[in-house]
A protein has these predicted regions:
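"…together with the soluble PPM/PP2C metallo-phosphatase catalytic core" -> "…together
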Residues: 1-221
Length: 221
């Protein structure tokens, strides 16, 4: 939508970043006390330090990312599917966090696997199997590429689910990683670069709330 109002992609990127940051920061402040609170995890290092802190911040910043992304990138079926999958992944973690009894790990893992499969099939359907790396370009077999995507997404969703206290670390690394790809491949990424900038804006707003002494956690969302 904003691309229709401004013909300059850099202006759209800047607006997307500012909107994502401001909206996430505002919603974090408004809904902080309405989120479920962490009980700490006995098997996590210093897990008791998280006890009593608001958790499920992903519910806020993922919805902010979804709203801003749909406003600043062209309206295409591929992007809508990714947005729905992002929200679905967040909701599965949020309902797990909010439940009085934590979900069975197989239930959460299966939901995440379905999301990863749909995301992989969607990406390959719209982008093909060609891989570009530096000056090289080659194609992977469809099945191999799909398996790699599934493993990457499923592992990324679950890598911090069994830990406490690394929310800020994972968000910081995500900002650095996404920013590095933007610097290296910004032109080639096209609309993905705008969505990535929105992600960075929302994550930086979350990190403001997560800075020591942190009061807001992502946990499984």
């Amino acid at each position: 939508m904003l691309q229709l109002l401004s013909g300059n992609p850099r202006t759209v990127d800047a607006l997307g970043f500012l909107l994502a940051f401001a909206l996430t920061a505002l919603m974090d402040s408004v809904f902080h006390d309405k989120l479920p609170h962490d009980h700490g995890r006995a098997f996590a290092v210093n897990g008791e330090l998280s006890k009593g802190k608001a958790r499920g911040s992903g519910l806020i910043f993922v919805l902010c990312i979804a709203l801003v992304t749909l406003a600043v990138v062209p309206f295409k079926a591929e992007y809508v599917i990714y947005t729905v999958l992002l929200i679905a992944s967040m909701l599965s973690g949020y309902f797990d966090d909010a439940a009085e009894t934590a979900w069975n790990e197989y239930k959460k893992g299966l939901i995440d696997l379905v999301i990863a499969v749909v995301a992989g099939v969607t990406y390959l359907n719209f982008n093909g199997t060609e891989v570009n790396f530096l000056s090289w370009s080659f194609s992977l077999p469809y099945a191999v590429y799909l398996i790699l995507i599934i493993v990457l997404i499923w592992a990324s969703i679950n890598v911090v689910n069994c830990t406490d206290g690394v929310d800020g670390l994972s968000a910081s690394l995500a900002v650095v990683s996404i920013g590095t790809f933007l610097l290296a491949y910004g032109e080639e990424l096209g609309d993905y670069s705008t969505a990535a900038i929105v992600f960075i804006g929302a994550l930086l707003a979350y990190l403001w709330s997560n800075a020591k002494p942190s009061s807001l956690l992502i946990v499984d969302t």
